[in-house]
Amino acid sequence: MPDYLVTLESAWYIKEAKTLDDAIGIAISEAGKRLNPSAKFVEVEAGMLACPFCERELSSAIVVADTALVGLILEMKVFRAESKEHASRIAKSVIGKALHEIPLKLLDVQEL
């Protein structure tokens, strides 16, 4: 059975964020706290989006009225899964249990 790298996207809501950098830092920190110790093997980083006009990469975070929405990328290696679908279900289950009500979206599954 092969191993897989599963990439998920999550949306993180932050209150009282003064700057974009603060919001991203808080989101990554809070995600890390929730993932540790049950899913400490999950990599967390700030998400990026492609601009539809110029195709440059933009931060997937926005701050309005001291409230932020930050897109995070979560990567997890899944070992000995039966298929890509099985690997994605395992990753969503493990990460979803740790993050509780945070929305998750599957972005990619790669065989290692």
Swiss-Prot record:
Give the domain of life: Archaea
Name any one Pfam family assigned in the record. DUF555
- InterPro entries assigned: UPF0212
**UniProt record similarity statement:** Belongs to the UPF0212 family.
Cite the NCBIfam families for this sequence. PRK03922.1
Q: What's the protein here called? A: UPF0212 protein Mboo_1659
**Source species taxonomy:** Archaea, Methanobacteriati, Methanobacteriota, Stenosarchaea group, Methanomicrobia
